[in-house]
Amino acid sequence: RSVIMQVLGTYHHNFVTHLLEAELQRQVYALAEAGQSITAAVLNQCKGNILSAFWGDTVEIDDGARMTWMRQPHYYMGLYPYTYSVGLVASTAMANLVRDQGPPAVKRWLQVLKAGGTLRPLELLQTAGIDLSTPQPIHDAVAYVGRLIDELEQSFAG
């Protein structure tokens, strides 16, 4: 149970938290490019709208939640939270390939590691057999999370 909970926490943090942060950044950049002033009130409103759209009526978004942008150092350094989600999707896809194909997938992954930064990221992952230009790897990662949840529920049931 402990391992499953840890893995689920990792997926939640990287799939939910970081993607919501990336959406805030996308919106803030759009506002800045449109010449709008970016104030704390604007950031609170953006964050609140993003959280409300994501959670719908299942979670009450209070003032504290609207201000969570203030505690994220990512916003002040390099602005890259989406890479956490992408990395987790890619690593889940690679783990699935290794599980399903064994040594041939391992050999392709070693080729990726040897290639390093000689190819663009999408091309590099395609070398391993991972196509992030489609939504399939995301669907597969979400399915994996679903299987983990099922396994966790079973562990509590019996």
Regions inferred by a protein language model and the residue ranges of each:
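Acidic/histidine-rich catalytic neighborhood
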Residues: 1-32
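C-terminal, non-catalytic "cap/extension" segments appended to globular domains
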Residues: 22, 28-158
